[in-house]
Design a protein with these regions (language model features):
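Non-catalytic interaction-recognition regions
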Residues: 1-440
Length: 440
């Protein structure tokens, strides 16, 4: 019964993630880790290398502990139950030791994570068996671990044995993630320790307006700039409910702008807009900043939002649709036509040439910006760049129309700049998990 319930819950989670264009290639189950005795294998490894030892004195007597390089607070550890109960705070020496196995033999949170981290790098000496969980999942077949060799299926990709491991866990788990790096180093795996990345992020809260719209009493957080989502307080937001609310609002806006669209098309476009609203909002802030989610801000067609970027891409697409109708020019024929177009507009020393080249050069920065985001683990630089690029295009098109430009050669060069911009913005949106609808 427990396995059935877990399976159904996971499938609903996957369906929700699929609404936001998020897919996975492997599901790992904690039960398989336990049944395959990953921890027992890792514990033997830790004992043999001396990375952990049994404390024989003080409040931690009988516990297997690991020496740690720096102190952490209970709040940082995120798991105060890891330490044995005590009436008094431990002394300085004990604060430099982290409990891995309690005196009653139970394994702490960080102990289990050590075994899992070793598996991720292919250092554990043990592996799961694998079976297909969903053959037609988003992006290809979705695999699942299994502890039963009889359930294993052939053809699984090579999971584990990673060169780099990036654990996406909120900032309150920073201390425990540091301990994982220290454990790898203590075992002699210095390279793997340096290649263990904690991609931390701050919490996501709600604006007061959004919390009220979702039906929550915000009086207890009246003196704070946001409403903290808390399971303990019973204040939570279901992702599907939020997406539904965003999609309903987006559908109303799309219908207002495109009264002739069938309901099915409106619904499909609204889902695309809702997804972009959430995904862009989640990456436009730096990782160290609390994200205060506001429905109206996320859905704005005119502010720094996913829908604004989508609209800027749709606008460029519409230009090419009308170019085809009026002048018989599409993106493929444009390249050939440019070969005979006079380059005067490109070579002129005037504001128009400066602005055209400015749009092209700004579009060309995408690869460098993405590289910066990877190096710094700060995806907000991509979001900020995409927003700036969309603004640059809107400013350019306002000053220099393409469709109504009477000079054919100038029209071609402007169209070429728009084509390059469109390709780069569409790629930037795709990197953030956002697609471009046909209308908005």
């Amino acid at each position: 019964m427990a396995a059935f319930i877990a399976d159904r819950v996971v499938r609903r989670h996957l369906a929700t993630m699929a609404r936001m264009n998020i897919g996975y290639d492997l599901l790992t189950w904690e039960g398989d880790i336990l049944r395959l005795q990953f921890w027992a294998h890792a514990f033997d490894f830790l004992k043999k290398t001396g990375a952990v030892f049994m404390q024989t004195e003080g409040k931690l007597a009988g516990c297997w502990v690991m020496k740690i390089e720096e102190e952490g607070t209970a709040a940082e550890e995120g798991a105060p139950e890891d330490e044995p109960p005590a009436d008094e705070a431990p002394d300085k020496a004990e604060q430099r030791e982290k409990v891995i196995v309690r005196s009653d033999g139970t394994v702490t949170y960080v102990g289990k994570d050590m075994a899992y981290q070793l598996w991720k790098f292919g250092l554990l000496g043990k592996d799961f068996h694998y079976r297909i969980f969903e053959p037609e999942a988003l992006g290809g077949p979705l695999w699942s671990t299994t502890s039963l060799e009889s359930s294993a299926q052939a053809g699984a990709p090579s999971f584990g044995r990673a060169s780099w491991v990036c654990n996406v866990i909120d900032t309150r788990q920073s201390y425990l993630q540091k301990l994982l790096k220290q454990a790898l180093a203590a075992l002699g795996y210095e390279q793997q320790a340096s290649h263990s990345i904690h991609y931390s992020y701050e919490m996501v809260a709600l604006s007061h307006a959004t919390a009220r719209e979702l039906g929550y009493d915000t009086s207890t957080d009246a003196d704070r700039p946001f409403v903290e989502v808390s399971g303990r307080k019973g204040l939570g937001v279901k992702a599907d409910d939020l997406l539904d609310r965003l999609a309903d609002k987006a559908a109303a806006e799309v219908s207002k702008r495109n009264a002739e669209l069938p309901d099915a098309d409106v619904k499909r476009i609204a889902e695309t807009i809702a997804t972009a609203a959430v995904r862009y909002f989640m990456v436009k802030f730096s990782r160290g900043k609390v994200i205060v989610f506001d429905i109206d801000e996320a859905l704005s067609f005119e502010g720094e939002s996913g829908p604004y970027l989508q609209y800027a891409a749709v606008r460029a697409n519409n230009i090419f649709g009308k170019l085809k109708e009026r002048h018989g020019i599409d993106e493929r024929s444009l390249l050939g036509a440019l070969a005979s177009a006079a380059p005067d507009v490109l070579q002129a020393d005037d504001q128009e040439a400066h602005d055209l080249w400015g749009l092209v050069l700004e579009s060309a920065r995408l690869d460098d910006v993405v590289d910066q985001g990877v190096r710094t683990l700060e995806l907000s630089v991509v979001a900020k760049y995409a927003f700036g690029l969309a603004q640059a295009f809107n400013g350019f098109y306002h000053k220099y129309p393409v469709l109504n430009e009477e000079r054919a050669d100038v029209r071609l060069w402007r169209a070429a700049a728009v084509a390059y911009y469109r390709a780069q913005l569409t790629q930037a949106l795709a990197l953030m998990g956002c697609t471009v609808p046909e209308k908005m």
